[in-house]
């Protein structure tokens, strides 16, 4: 599939069938995710893959409000959950090493991490997996995480932050309808509105 086609076809799917996702497809999606940019080659982003029905239902428990409103619990429906985790300390340790320009004794997060690399790298991994899912003809969505609950449930070490979950599955026939109910569709802002050349324009 051409890259531009994958970008244009990507959608957040909020209703899944019970059809499983081939493990080989999941592995390829994860492999693409790990190939994202990583500051200083820190490689502090890791994934927990959850396929167990009971565990997925537990993870989805915090989304009961959707069910109460008459929507499917799409988090529980998705047969694969990829919990994306990132480690701030791995990045801090990497940037203390001699080959990094910022290896100074008195650095602080406030000085050097105004926009932390561990979040931008994790976001890049998420985006790559969402696009890879399109290429695999797999439906996907990204949802925020309840970090403390996920850490306890999945045994995630204290030094790692669960930043969200990539849901993988196959879209149900009503997927677009439920997506529109949960977030009214809007057209993309035109390129001329979002791009500023040389100086921010009105």
Residue ranges and their predicted role:
Residues 42-122:
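Glycine/small-residue-rich phosphate/adenosyl-binding loop
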Residues 13-28:
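A short N-terminal beta-strand-loop micro-motif at the entrance of redox/enzyme domains
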Residues 29, 33-34, 82, 102-153:
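Small-aliphatic-rich amphipathic alpha-helix that forms the alpha element of a beta-alpha
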Residues 68-81, 156-178:
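A glycine-rich helix N-cap at a beta->alpha junction
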Residues 3-13, 88-90, 164-202:
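C-terminal helix-cap and adjacent tail motif
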